[in-house]
Amino acid sequence: MRLALLVLATIGYAVADLFTSIADMQNLLETERNIPKILDKYIHDEEERLVQLKKLSEEYSKKNEISIENGLKDITNPINAFLLIKRKIFDWKEIESKMNANKAGNVVSSITDDSYGVRYPTADDLSGAAIGLLRLQDTYRLDTKDLADGKIYADQGNYTFSAKDCFEIARAAYNEHDFYHTVMWMEEAQRRLGDEVEPTVEVEDILEYLAFALYKQNNLKHALKLTEELYKMNPTHPRAKGNVKWYEDLLEQEGVRRSDMRKNLPPIQNRRPDSVLGNTERTMYEALCRNEVPVSQKDISRLYCYYKRDRPFLVYAPIKVEIKRFNPLAVLFKDVISDDEVAAIQELAKPKLARATVHDSVTGKLVTATYRISKSAWLKEWEGDVVETVNKRIGYMTNLEMETAEELQIANYGIGGHYDPHFDHAKKEESKSFESLGTGNRIATVLFYMSQPSHGGGTVFTEAKSTILPTKNDALFWYNLYKQGDGNPDTRHAACPVLVGIKWVSNKWIHEKGNEFRRPCGLKSSDYERFVGDLGYGPEPRNAPNVSPNLAKDVWETL
């Protein structure tokens, strides 16, 4: 998915959450094929209408020639006067009718009609897409000019941004009181405007927004300079003159003499807000998303892969396990969902996709949040054989009870789609979070990767300082609670924004009830699993004998 996001300029009337899901964007892309046919028909109808109007014009020209020749005789004759009035009433109605017979409204309705099964973007979708782009820029440290040129790392896209596109991104930031990005993108809009033969945006608009953003970023002299440029360009501008005086007064309050207000302009300062720079978790989260946090060789040397064969069925169909981290344990179950199963689950989920929600820590109710941008759907076991099969397989993978687990949740991430650092389990003070379920806290999480983005979209643990990049057909698993039942703070994790590509995941949250003997309580918080299903005794599976992977594959396909 490249930087074609500003195609979202079409304004519709739907709920503004199209940008939260690439699946909806794919549907929108499909409708582009219908537009040329609709426009061609509209052009044909308009050409016919214009031919009729031209004919009426020629008829009136002939009548006018006669009227000019006869002069006042026409209107002094009562019959002619009557006919003149009649023509003005009835003939003009015909002309007016043909002029108003423009079918543009019908064309727009047909393009945006819900009967196509596609919701068209709104102005809020455009804003959401722009904010998503800014999130990507920050997380992956992308250069503004490179992004505007359609370049992401070494990937050169098919589209570049105009000055207007950059202006709209900057304005979206401005509306969020994000003056850091406003400055960056207004400056880029200004640079691009200078290269445009046909300007796509008014320079006055850029100067006014940029001046105010520079002021908010502590660049008063630069704000004054740009506002004076605006005033010289348009002395009748409704705010320019007043803003010049306002900036002069502010500089005077800072002790700057009026004679020095336009001298010795310092370099422009444009720092990210202190609320971000001072947030150590945010800094760690972004570094982990860039996969820049090194793992010690000592820790790596302890990791290993093995075949999980601790259930009778698994003797014949062992599951490949890759340990990614100890304490808290996190593993990847390899190749545990097939492409066909992924496709089937996606088809079941697509009609049900809705803006993803989170549990309100006070009320326990589900609400949308800006820190979780994606769409999700819940699939019950009876909705498809594939759901029942996957649920049964999760039981073999984890050795945990599925009867009290939540339904299978499917998520699709949109432009800059992400989920900020959070816990899957409820903390002690969040006693109402899962009260309605009556199954206790979330003991563990299984996360299936159903696609593999080209860049971004990793799962990161901000306290454990580890990054797991998505690998299609694999499933990430970890325990959320200590064995004695308390929440493990080291399981705080996040979904990194998707930079390039599509991210589909499905997850299963497994609860405490029914797992009293499958995962017995430990005596202290330091008790933790060495491997999946570790009951505290027996050897590690590190040296377990391997089996033929083909045998496992054949057996699983019969399940």
From Swiss-Prot:
GO cellular component, one term: endoplasmic reticulum lumen
Residues annotated as binding 2-oxoglutarate: 503
Alphabetic keyword roster: Dioxygenase, Endoplasmic reticulum, Glycoprotein, Iron, Metal-binding, Oxidoreductase, Signal, Vitamin C
Single GO term (MF): peptidyl-proline 4-dioxygenase activity
Segments forming domain Fe2OG dioxygenase: 404-512
Cofactor list: Fe(2+); L-ascorbate
Any one of the GO BP annotations: collagen and cuticulin-based cuticle development
Transmembrane portions of the chain: none
Enzyme class: oxidoreductase
Positions bound to Fe cation: 422, 424, 493
Predominant subcellular localization, coarse grouping: endoplasmic reticulum
Cofactor note: Binds 1 Fe(2+) ion per subunit.
Subcellular location: Endoplasmic reticulum lumen
Function: Catalyzes the post-translational formation of 4-hydroxyproline in -Xaa-Pro-Gly- sequences in collagens and other proteins.
Annotated family: Belongs to the P4HA family.
UniProt name for this protein: Prolyl 4-hydroxylase subunit alpha-1
Species of provenance: Caenorhabditis elegans
Gene name linked to the record: dpy-18
